[in-house]
């Protein structure tokens, strides 16, 4: 039985001490530590090769990153500032993939988004009609009177859209009616097919776009992407309460269709908060088995992408009036490192990058606060810190690779 699987000795040692010796696990980069960068661990020796190769040709073709996670990255937390930093280096105008409807749209700062009259289905929905789920784990069915409007975020580099891409499946006679800025409404028929399709709208200066869909009986929407012909893009695929295991429900058949349009070169996985328990005695062998299989299956669906697994963040609990790290956090961190090791993918220890033991208490108590009072979730200020740390770690590895391989 999966629950009877035993973790490796590394995981057992982590239950005794929340700071597993890095030298026991992987040859660590002391130069990065000295530079104030918490480095990425490479468990295959070439775990970011596809990503590096794509960056080498970024002047010819855009590079796209998928960032899957739970409520820790809701509202574009972390991914927003990862995107900003990497786009400053590699170019790119746009926030990437955005949902049709979102319960955290008012919280997100990287895009302004309003909507009405949509039915939403997710990997975690109790009942899903006979429709495919999108690459983000969400699908959207327009209801009577549906509308959705997008405006750029309030940052100088995000003051307009250039390209809008709508991903959908239309088995009927649906049409799109859209308005750019304050112009006249334009109507377009949506391609009829059982496959995933993309409709492209381009303009030099889109300051707002409003859409509504008609004749929608056999129409499913998956998302809207805001990007350009070149540059780097980061897509936030957050889902509240997701442990990561529900990714197994994503259909390889449809994932390959989405990837034909999006062509990911790096897929980041951030999970664990919905799995770690307050006890430190759980082995989590079942979780290792499930997640390694999921990563193996995702590799098959995204053959030209690399994978980067983030460890769980710190999480605080109240013990006798003092906020301390929850006992299960260091165990989950070691479990995730073992998942990365068995999967031969890259790993970034977000727990240590945050500051390690009791760091969430410090984030919440900072002036101004960097995290919420639940001692679990970062706010935008805290997300900016971690997003930049992750970007610095990636840029450090990219620079090291380029220096080693002697290309500009």
List the predicted regions and their residue ranges.
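Conserved, compact domain cores that house catalytic/ligand-binding motifs in diverse enzymes
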Residues: 61-69, 74, 78, 231-323, ...
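Glycine-rich phosphate-binding "P-loop"
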Residues: 36-40, 175, 183-184
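Conserved SGNH/GDSL esterase-like catalytic core that processes O-acyl groups on lipids
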Residues: 74-181, 189-289, 377-378
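Bacterial Sec-dependent N-terminal signal peptides
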Residues: 1-15, 19, 401-408
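A generic secondary-structure signal
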Residues: 54, 85, 256-258, 297-298, ...
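Extracytoplasmic/secreted envelope proteins and their assembly/folding machinery
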Residues: 48, 52, 79-83, 288-295, ...
